[in-house]
Amino acid sequence: MSIAAERKAEVIKTNARKDGDTGSPEVQVAILSERIANLTAHFKTHVKDNHSRRGLLKLVSTRRSLLDYVKKRDEARYKALLEKHNIRR
């Protein structure tokens, strides 16, 4: 499931490292986390929706790859991301 444009803009604004930043790993992880949360809520009512579940697994995998990249570059940023978005590791 996608997120509304205004919600996406809000997520970008709160997680951007500088003005106009949409591509940093922090912003990408935040957007993916928002989409993952939306899909998780969707699965509470639509338990048998296996096609969307596959999409959820792809999103989680992409977020994991981005987090691994951040961890390799800067451990402090990685820990801050985990803390901010309540991601288990």
From Swiss-Prot:
InterPro entries hit by this protein: Ribosomal_uS15 (IPR000589), Ribosomal_uS15_bac-type (IPR005290), uS15_NS1_RNA-bd_sf (IPR009068)
Keyword Ribonucleoprotein included in the entry's annotation: yes
Q: Which PROSITE patterns match?
A: RIBOSOMAL_S15
Q: Where is this region: Disordered?
A: 1-24
Question: Looking at the UniProt record for this protein, which Gene Ontology cellular component terms does it annotate, in alphabetical order?
Answer: cytosolic small ribosomal subunit
Q: Which SMART domains match?
A: Ribosomal_S15
Q: Where is the composition biased (Basic and acidic residues)?
A: 1-21
Give a GO biological-process term: translation
Q: Which UniProt keywords apply?
A: Ribonucleoprotein, Ribosomal protein, RNA-binding, rRNA-binding
In alphabetical order, the GO MF annotations are:
rRNA binding; structural constituent of ribosome
Database matches in SUPFAM superfamilies:
S15/NS1 RNA-binding domain
Which superkingdom, per the lineage? Bacteria
Residue spans making up a coiled coil are none
- Which Gene3D superfamilies does the annotation name? 6.10.250.3130, S15/NS1, RNA-binding (1.10.287.10)
Q: Does the keyword Hydrolase apply?
A: no
Which HAMAP family does the UniProt entry name for this protein?
Ribosomal_uS15_B
Q: Which family does it belong to?
A: Belongs to the universal ribosomal protein uS15 family.
Assembly, in brief, is:
Part of the 30S ribosomal subunit. Forms a bridge to the 50S subunit in the 70S ribosome, contacting the 23S rRNA.
The function of this protein is: One of the primary rRNA binding proteins, it binds directly to 16S rRNA where it helps nucleate assembly of the platform of the 30S subunit by binding and bridging several RNA helices of the 16S rRNA. Forms an intersubunit bridge (bridge B4) with the 23S rRNA of the 50S subunit in the ribosome.
**Protein name per Swiss-Prot or TrEMBL:** Small ribosomal subunit protein uS15
Which species does the entry assign this protein to?
Answer: Rhodopseudomonas palustris (strain BisA53)
